[in-house]
């Protein structure tokens, strides 16, 4: 899930993860956005959130500088279980279905790309993402920023699809078009555009925007709750949200 900040991609990621878990799938939720809000959007209190990977200087030194040498292909197979916390379901599982497990890893975003420590953290972050996407036979949902910098070309080859999220505004759509273009340059062609808080009108055909589009209307239940509760789950509109997400997964071929 990628797009301009504030467009609702974290909400969409939280909703999708919860739907998948309620229908029996194990899901890894990866928060790779600067805002670090996927856990709270999924119902976790602030004190239960794990420390972001990019702030774990001990792990960065241990894995990237093991033996005194710079290792840009570190061993990370044990890290997902070490870094993750379990996330409760936001609603009842589908009748007759054993619920899946939702686990959250907070990676954070490397903001000081010129610094050596930041570059080391970025290498470890990319290695963990690559391991989850390439070596685990489970759902992996990544809440990205307005780009796909965390996904190298080798990892993208194993990514099933990209959800580009936008508001119904030209600035937001232009950012979405740039995200789509960058992802296609890496070989990620399976993309769907979700226009969030859409109240009507045609979505403009901008170069770079994904050709397949879904719209999500404003949700009154979410708007009423946002000042008192960070969670976006278990809304009055939950059934309608689930229906839209099922259409999204179908468009992605899942």
Where are these predicted regions, by residue range?
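Switch II (G3) loop of P-loop NTPases
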Residues: 107-113, 117-118, 129-151
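Conserved lysine of the Walker
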Residues: 9
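Hydrophobic anchor at the beta1->P-loop junction of P-loop NTPases
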Residues: 1
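C-terminal lobe/tail of nucleotide-utilizing enzymes
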Residues: 182-254
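Walker A (P-loop) phosphate-binding loop of P-loop NTPases
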Residues: 5-6
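Hydrophobic positions on the alpha1 helix immediately C-terminal to the Walker A/P-loop
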Residues: 12
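N-terminal phosphate/diphosphate-binding loop that engages ATP/GTP or pyrophosphate donors
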Residues: 19-98
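Inter-motif core of Ras-like GTPase G domains
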Residues: 127-136, 150-170
């Amino acid at each position: 899930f990628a797009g301009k900040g504030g467009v609702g991609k974290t909400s969409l990621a939280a909703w999708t993860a919860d739907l998948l878990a309620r229908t029996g799938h194990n899901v890894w939720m990866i928060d790779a956005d600067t805002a670090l809000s996927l856990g709270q959007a999924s119902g976790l209190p602030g004190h239960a959130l794990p420390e972001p990977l990019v702030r774990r200087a001990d792990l960065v030194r241990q894995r990237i500088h093991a033996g005194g040498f710079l290792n840009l292909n570190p061993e990370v197979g044990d890290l997902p279980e070490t870094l993750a916390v379990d996330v409760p379901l936001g609603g009842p599982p589908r009748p007759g279905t054993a619920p899946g497990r939702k686990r959250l890893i907070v990676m954070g975003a490397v903001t000081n790309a010129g610094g050596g420590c930041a570059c080391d953290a970025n290498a470890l972050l990319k290695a963990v993402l690559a391991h989850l996407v390439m070596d685990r036979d489970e759902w992996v949902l990544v809440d990205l920023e307005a780009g796909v910098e965390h996904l190298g070309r080798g990892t993208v080859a194993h990514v099933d699809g990209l959800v580009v999220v936008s508001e119904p505004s030209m600035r937001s759509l232009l950012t979405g078009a740039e995200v789509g273009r960058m992802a296609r340059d890496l070989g990620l062609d399976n993309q769907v555009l979700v226009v969030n808080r859409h109240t009507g009108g045609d979505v403009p055909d901008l170069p770079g925007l994904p050709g397949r589009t879904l719209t999500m209307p404003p949700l009154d239940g979410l708007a009423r709750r946002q000042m008192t509760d960070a969670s976006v789950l278990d809304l009055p509109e939950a059934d309608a949200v689930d229906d839209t997400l099922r259409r999204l997964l179908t468009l992605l071929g899942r």
